A protein has these predicted regions:
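N-terminal Rossmann-like NAD(P)+-binding subdomain of aldehyde/semialdehyde dehydrogenases
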Residues: 1-120
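Flexible, glycine/charged-enriched surface loops at secondary-structure junctions
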Residues: 99-104, 225, 262-267, 287-298, ...
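Conserved small-residue-rich beta-alpha loop and adjacent elements
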Residues: 104-170
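A conserved active-site cap/scaffold subdomain adjacent to cofactor or substrate pockets
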Residues: 228-300, 304
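Short acidic-hydrophobic, aromatic-tinged amphipathic segments that line or gate anion-handling sites
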Residues: 3-8, 179-184, 304-309
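C-terminal core of ALDH-fold dehydrogenases
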Residues: 318-455
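Conserved NAD(P)+-binding/catalytic subdomain of aldehyde/semialdehyde dehydrogenases
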Residues: 174-247, 251-254, 258-263
């Protein structure tokens, strides 16, 4: 791991961090070509890409729903128990996020409010092929169902024999997925965004994927909603000498084993503790079945920040704005209020980050690459729309029309003022409409009073 030592009064700079930055132009170009092709040729293009990238000939992308039931019977009952426990706790957490439509009224009878509506269909991308991520199925599909989305569609790359992992299928059953399609990559994102003969389009697309999936999501984001353009996973551990070095090392490795590009930060005021943590890696890596990936991540993307004091350490955490933050330090809960930027915060020595990955309840789809400074975890809010509701009475109109016309005149928007002025005239003169009515001076209906020009400074 690279070590950055901050002198007293020195701040960590964002430029010192191993950010992956923007998606490479070559990947964006490749993804754009795939998206355009699927948009134009639909299922024909999808089949060609499935053969090219997954090595599978696909006749029907739609996965038979009965395979979900068969998967429930095929996997170890202990896995089903774990799935159901995780699903229950994820559902319970996200039910607290549910918004209701609300309305309020003024004394003049005007009604104002917000109408909350679930989106029509949500597309969920679940990585597959050689890997299997049933936790992603739960985390991305359950909030959509809690929000009231009637059509939750899952896409995932087929395995070499053309099927889907039984773990993924079992999770889809538990999560309440409505449709599953065996297709992955940028081509799956294009299908969800624009629709094909086999795969009807969805209003929003969520879920993690490789760089091509991320690029495709970015490309289609003007035509379908997306949750985020996610980069490699990351963890930041803020620790002091009260933490256990072996546990902290394991927590860093838990992120590093995802991907050679996964980023691990250890922030501390104790250089000796940082060395102690790094000294634990060799023993733990010797037992790890993913040692090669983990070692590469720690060596190339791992960073130790040694700060002069706790204030500087917390400032460094906020500059990093990590996807996952662990507070392994004395009075961890007392520090919570000082943390400004983090996707998920794991407080205290017992709050293992993998608990949040799988079963705690809060969502594990989190902003990466410093975007936690302005972005949020996936939630029920990602699967709803909010519409403002405005309903005026004649009395309410008369109260607000004059100010509306004045504002419109200041902006030079004559028809805006006329729209309010015509209604005002109807109320003032008891008219039901303007058929056969002489409007007279239309300009005075729009702008009853001329605004004085702004005074010039003397």
């Amino acid at each position: 791991m690279k070590t950055i030592t901050l002198d007293p009064g020195e701040r960590l700079a964002a430029g010192q961090l191993p950010r992956q930055g923007v998606l490479p132009a070559a990947i964006m170009q490749s993804a754009q070509a795939i998206v355009d092709d699927v948009r134009e040729r639909g299922d024909v293009a999808l089949r060609e890409y499935c053969k090219k990238f997954d090595g599978v000939d696909v006749d029907d992308f739609r996965v038979d729903p009965k395979l979900m039931d068969e998967a429930i019977q095929a996997v170890d009952p202990a896995f089903i128990e774990a799935l159901k426990k995780a699903a229950a706790q994820i559902r319970e957490f996200h039910e607290r996020e549910v918004e209701q439509s609300w309305f309020t009224s003024r004394a003049d009878g005007t009604i104002l409010g917000v109408k909350v509506t679930p989106i029509s269909a949500a597309g969920v991308y679940v990585p597959g092929g050689r890997a299997q991520y049933p936790s992603t199925v739960l985390m991305d599909c359950i909030p959509a169902k809690v929000a009231g989305v009637k059509r939750v569609v899952m896409v995932t790359p087929p395995q070499k024999e053309g099927g889907i992992s039984p773990y993924t299928l079992a999770a889809a059953k538990v999560a309440g997925v409505d449709e599953i399609y065996a297709v992955g990559g940028a081509q799956a994102i294009a299908a969800l965004a624009y629709g094909t003969d086999s795969i009807p389009k969805t209003a929003k697309i969520v879920g993690p994927g490789n760089a091509f999936v991320a690029a495709a999501k970015k490309i289609v984001s003007g035509d379908a909603g997306i949750d985020m353009v996610a980069g490699p996973s990351e963890v930041c551990v803020l620790a002091d000498a009260t933490a256990d070095a072996t546990v902290v090392a394991a927590d860093l490795m838990a992120q590093a084993e995802h991907d050679p590009l996964a980023t691990c930060y250890l922030v501390t005021c104790d250089a000796a503790f940082a060395e102690k943590v790094q000294g634990r890696f060799a023993e733990l890596l010797a037992a790890s079945p993913r040692a090669e990936i983990t070692s590469a991540s720690l060596a190339d993307q791992g960073v130790v920040v040694v700060a002069a004091d706790l204030e500087a350490a917390i400032d460094a955490v906020n500059v990093i704005a990590p996807e996952h933050l662990e507070l392994h330090c004395d009075n961890a809960m007392g520090l919570l209020g000082k943390i400004e930027n983090a996707g998920a915060i794991f407080v205290g020595p017992w709050s293992s980050e993998p608990l949040g990955d799988y079963v705690a309840g809060p969502n594990h789809t989190l902003p990466t690459g410093g975007t936690a400074a302005f972005s949020n975890p996936l939630s029920v809010q990602d699967f709803i729309t909010r519409s403002s509701v405005i309903c005026y009475t004649p009395e309410g109109l008369m109260n607000d029309a004059p100010a509306t016309q004045t504002m419109a005149q200041a902006e030079g928007l004559w028809a805006h003022a006329l729209s309010a002025g015509l209604r005002r005239k109807m109320v003032e003169e008891g008219l039901e409409g303007f058929d056969g009515v002489d409007l007279g001076d239309i300009n005075r209906i729009a702008w009853p009073v001329d605004l004085a020009a702004p005074k010039k400074a003397e």
